[in-house]
Structures are given as C-alpha cells and as structure tokens.
C-alpha cells in the first residue's frame, strides 16, 4: 500500500551493497604486534582481492551475491557483473563503504584494466558515516547495531573460514561466506531505512523528482513546521505526515524553484 500523498511514480533505484575481501599472506619471523613490510608478502597473497559482493535493491527483495567462484577465484568477473548493477542505481549505499568498499572496488577495476567509474563517488552514501554523525553508540560495528535495533546481528564467521575459502579446503565455508555477505547487506538496508528519518542523506527525493516533496520518502503530504535560521538565511521547515518526521526546508524569501533541500 502506498503512503498518503505519494503518487504512483517511477521510484529512485537505491542499491545497498557489501564486499568481502581475501586476506593478505606474509612471511614473518615471530608472532605478536609488528610492522610487516611489503617485501614479506607471499606470492599468492601479495595483494587484496574481492571474494564476493552482495547487493539488494530498496524494494524488500532478498539480497543476491556475485562471487569469484570457489574453484575459479576470478574477481575480474565479479567487478564486471557488479558494475552493470551500479549503472542502474541512482544512489549506492554501504556500511563503511567510503573508506573500504569503494576503494577496494576501484582498485580491482584498475588492477584488472576494467573501465573506470570516477563519478561513482558522486552517488554513494555511507551508513556508518551517517550513524557516527548523528548518533552515539558504544560500538559502531554492524553486529552491535544490528542486535541493538532488533535485527539479530551478523552471521558468525571465523578466520578459519577465510583460510578454507582461499585455500579451497572447505566449500561449506564458501557457502557460509555468501550467506554472511547477504545478511550484512539486508541489515544495512534495514538499518538505513530505520535511521533515515533522523538524518539528512546525500540523496534527496525532492532533488530526484525536481519538485516540492519530502526529501526522505517523496510524499507531498507535508505541513509547515516552524521557521529556522542559518546564518543570514531564514528557512521554512516542513513535517512529513506520511513518515512522521522532518521533510526538509525552503529558504524564505526565495526567487528560485521551490525544491526542498
């Protein structure tokens, strides 16, 4: 059932995603905390690689996974397939993705001589960055926040599972990794939708549609909710009756088109 005030229109394509990477392998002289030089990296474990990428659209459908193949271990194909998905999205969202996932995916494009997507960063957002900006939790791990907000936490993985996958010792670990990856994405999606009314995301529904509506859910069922000042600018703020929260603001007076920002 559609929310009041939300027309039957083309919806923006919001993509949630998460990657899992291969560990590095190095020769060391002792155990414990130490600095490992790049010259100590073993031949088959000298650079990062992507085992799988899970993704889900913001339509409630289950997450899917693109993996490198238990036997083949071909990450080039993973990036090629995922880039086809990215190009369909209006916004992509991960957790700690600005610092981790995006850079790893960009690196694999470079290493595999695949077409670059330098504008990708223009339409990404990061669940962890938004949570750290607007909230205070004892831990910002996905496992902790997932449990705290009723999603059950992450699928349990052990470091041995990564070894079993990389060395092709146990296919069950590979299957578990894919399930682990998909659960992370589904939790990212659920958490994003839960926190969204409390934050100001990079992606605005009002900007997407190019008119006057809620920046979060695209509803037009709004009411005025007080006046605020920022510097010398006066703003009319709005409340969204559809999702029951902040809907955006408009500068007063404004000679420009009325688009909530």
Regions inferred by a protein language model and the residue ranges of each:
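Conserved RNase H-like, two-metal-ion catalytic cores of nucleic-acid enzymes
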Residues: 2-86
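Conserved DEDDh/DEDDy metal-dependent 3′-5′ exonuclease domain
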Residues: 59-144
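Acidic, Mg2+-coordinating catalytic module of metal-dependent nucleases/exonucleases
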Residues: 93, 141-208
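Residues immediately within or flanking Cys/His clusters that coordinate Zn2+
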Residues: 209-214, 237
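Short, cysteine/histidine-rich loop/knuckle motifs that typically chelate Zn2+
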Residues: 215-219, 242
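Short, non-ligating residues that shape and space the ligands of small metal-coordination modules
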Residues: 220-226, 248-250
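Short linker/helix segments within small regulatory modules
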Residues: 226-237
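Short metal-binding segments enriched for Cys and/or His
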Residues: 237-261
């Amino acid at each position: 059932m559609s929310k009041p005030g939300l027309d039957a229109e083309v919806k923006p394509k919001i993509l949630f995603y998460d990657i899992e990477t291969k560990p590095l392998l190095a020769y060391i002289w002792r155990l414990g905390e130490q600095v490992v030089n790049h010259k100590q990296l073993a031949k088959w474990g000298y650079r990062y690689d992507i085992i799988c990428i899970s993704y889900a659209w913001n339509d409630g459908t289950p997450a899917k996974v693109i993996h490198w193949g238990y036997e083949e271990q071909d990450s080039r194909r993973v990036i090629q397939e995922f880039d086809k998905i990215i190009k369909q999205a209006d916004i992509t969202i991960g957790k700690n993705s600005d610092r981790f996932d995006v850079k790893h995916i960009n690196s694999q494009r470079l290493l595999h001589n695949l077409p670059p997507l330098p504008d990708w960063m223009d339409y990404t957002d990061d669940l962890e960055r938004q949570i750290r900006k607007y909230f205070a939790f004892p831990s910002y791990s996905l496992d902790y926040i997932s449990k705290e907000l009723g999603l059950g936490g992450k699928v349990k993985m052990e470091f041995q599972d990564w070894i079993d996958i990389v060395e092709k010792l146990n296919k069950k670990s590979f299957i578990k990794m894919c399930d682990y990856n998909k659960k992370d994405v589904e939790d990212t999606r659920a958490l994003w939708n839960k926190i969204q009314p409390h934050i100001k995301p990079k992606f605005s529904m009002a900007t997407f549609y190019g008119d006057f509506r809620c920046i979060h859910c695209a509803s037009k069922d709004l009411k005025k909710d007080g006046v605020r000042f920022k510097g010398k600018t006066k703003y009319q703020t709005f409340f969204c009756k559809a999702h029951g929260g902040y809907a955006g603001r408009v500068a007063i007076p404004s000679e420009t088109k009325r688009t909530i920002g």
